[in-house]
A protein has these predicted regions:
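Metal-cofactor-dependent catalytic cores
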Residues: 1-168
Length: 168
């Protein structure tokens, strides 16, 4: 939280605190790419999309706009699809097996939909990547077709009854 300029949180920032099933050290959104295939223990997994932060993070940590800060900074994490099931142990290393789209980092993907002005070439790039989740490709197609980005406010801030007042 210090790097983001936030005061001490309501809950501890530790592995699984953000609702993730897997946590690791060292690999960032600026390094990991959509479509990356990793061997993790006996499992084979693939990065399918950036994580879309939601208002539940605001509630858990006591910051009214933590989800927005995460989205704006691109520090959201990512989702993995399982290509091959297998046992995974806490000591297993994440081994990169394939990187089909080195030009499409998780951060760049998130920035295209969340943080930059509409750019047809970038939206088309998302549509052309079958490893990107169908949901994210749908968002890109909608923005490309209708010229309007999705309204993220409900996801980021939640229903009115869940919104926290800003911290002073």
């Amino acid at each position: 939280q210090t790097a983001l300029g936030l005061p001490a949180p309501r809950a501890s920032w530790q592995p699984a605190a953000f609702g993730e099933n897997l946590s690791g050290l060292g690999l960032t959104e600026a390094q990991a790419c959509i479509g990356d295939v990793y061997r993790l223990g006996a499992a084979l997994v693939q990065i399918s999309q950036p994580r879309s932060p939601c208002f539940k993070l605001n509630q858990r940590f006591g910051y009214s706009h933590l989800s927005q800060v995460m989205q704006l900074t691109g520090r959201c994490g990512w989702l993995l699809r399982v290509l091959e099931e297998g046992r995974v142990d806490p000591v297993d290393a994440l081994l990169l097996m394939d990187r089909p789209y080195p030009e499409l980092t998780v951060k760049r993907t998130a920035d295209i939909l969340f943080n930059q002005a509409r750019h047809e070439g970038d939206l088309q790039l998302l549509l052309e990547k079958p490893a990107l989740s169908p949901n994210w490709r749908q968002h890109a197609a909608h923005w490309l077709e209708h010229g309007v980005v999705a309204d993220w406010r409900r996801r980021l801030l939640g229903p009115a009854e869940f919104q926290l007042p800003p911290k002073a």
